[in-house]
Amino acid sequence: ANGGDVLEVQLVDKVLSPDGSVVMEKQPNITSHLDGVDASLSVIRQGMKGVISAEDGGTASEYFRNFDYTDQVGAKTGTAQVNLIDLENNAWFVAFAPYEEPEIAVVVFIANGYKGGVASLTSKDVIANYFERKNNPEIDEVPVQDSFVP
């Protein structure tokens, strides 16, 4: 979703103090670039937008029906077959948002999750939380030591 840049993995891009000042900020580090991506990228992105589109009958469209941010997400479902008795297939779902200028990517894997669309439910919640916090930064809570804020 970024034009072929391969970035170093990082979980946190910045840390803010309770008053909103930046305590630490880390810039993305490009480790390499995939050549030839530009020619195919628009077709791939269009296909990923169709995955959650009810209009296109996408494989995850039923899970994104009435989702406020559907037009701002690109995604792909995946099902990895399991050939053992009494086990269901593994479910994969990958998504990025915002669609035009991606800032986040979400990958969900559920062992024996049946099909990729099932994994999209978790991704949808993460994306909704991202947009709600981005659009309403005052809802952020600062956790006290040794606690967790969902």
What are these regions (language model features)?
Residues 28-38:
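Short surface loop/edge beta-strand patches of beta-sandwich-type extracellular domains
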Residues 137-150:
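Short, highly charged C-terminal tails/helix-capping segments
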Residues 1-18, 22-30, 48, 52-137:
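Active-site beta-strand/loop architecture of penicillin-binding DD-peptidases
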